[in-house]
Amino acid sequence: MGETDLQNGEIRDFPSFSHRGFMLDTGRKFIPYDTLVDIMLNMAYYKMNDLQLHLNDNYIFLKEHLAGKNLSPEEQLKYVLEHAKTGFRVETDIVGKNGQKLTSDEHYTKEEMQNLIKLAKALHINLVPEIDTPGHALSFVKVRPDLMYQGSLSDYAGKHNVERVAMLDLD
């Protein structure tokens, strides 16, 4: 055989794992639409098949946010609602009574989200647009303060509640 010849044979190329992917946090750090498209094209090339888009988040660290401020609990809540930064990266028309918009300035339009879903399907990528609640729901609470939990979370800290666990019904 010459230097440019190959023997007859068979090449089988397939991934070793059924789930091959990752999560992108676009809630805290906006990733432009064109970059997401490029990422998905690269994922397909490397046979990756799962992409979770984290579309909302809070960028607050309460201790640092309230450091040096002598505020009552009510004043702390008001300060956080007025000053803490949030991200909600999907276009929506929702506006609170206070004039606060749910959608961040940097966001994906409805058309862009539909295009990402179509592209993912064509590339055999399982795209999961994820809205993280209740833990990262400050963007919702700024628009709809009535959705805010009013009880004390410290009542549950470190305690096991059989009724809450049973409610999950993991069977």
Per-range role (PLM):
Residues 1-170:
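Feature activates predominantly on carbohydrate-active enzymes
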